[in-house]
Amino acid sequence: LKFSPTGPSFRLRNWIGRLMRRNHRKVLIIDEEIVFLGGVNVKAKFRAWDDMYLKLTGNLARPLLRGFAKSYISSGGNRRNVRRFLGRGLEKFIPIWRDKLKFIIHSPNSASLPRGQRVFSTALAMAKETFNLLTPYYVPDRKFLKAVRLARKRGVKVNIFLPRRTDVRLAELIARAYYDITTRAGADIYFLPDMHHGKAMTVDKNLGMVGSMNLTPRSFSHQEESGVSFTDSEMVDELNALFNDLRQRA
């Protein structure tokens, strides 16, 4: 077992950014063929939390090996140990899935920042009937709230699922400041009785997403995140069924 904390080097000129930045991805890769990806942390106290993750098997797991290799190197690992994972060839997985499944590998220091920041607003703009969102920490920006208002004008039912209480008191207080403006924009907020750490989204019956991204500025600007979006109808239906279960519990 080898362990290296993220960001081993230190530079005075960007010490604040390094202080805020962290690797928030939650990805488990087993034998290069099985991947668990979502919001699950590894710590004893988190066992009591509800969470959500996606399991991928076979060639579908290969594109994430490249992201792991980059994190391994940036954490101080020897590049030679993961060189074979850095080739683009790993991303050429089963052709039939290429248009049905896309990985979201977000880094605050890369061009993926706008993409990561627009994930939720762009998805909401696509909705025609229903938009479901699960996030434990909720600090929406103006673009997201505007997207909620426009969606309601189109007749879209916007459902946002949040835990009634979280493990971060400050984050909970900040989220409460947005409840009223969010409902006035047209969304329905469902409060879950237990701590739910999952991060997921569905757009109608057409699109689903599971990952580690919270709807907060910190998640977009300072954290490395991972997720997977999918359009496979069975996968989206299953995720919508989970949202229906959450609605019954709220």
Q: What annotation goes with each model-predicted range?
A:
Residues L1-A250:
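Charged, low-complexity intrinsically disordered terminal segments
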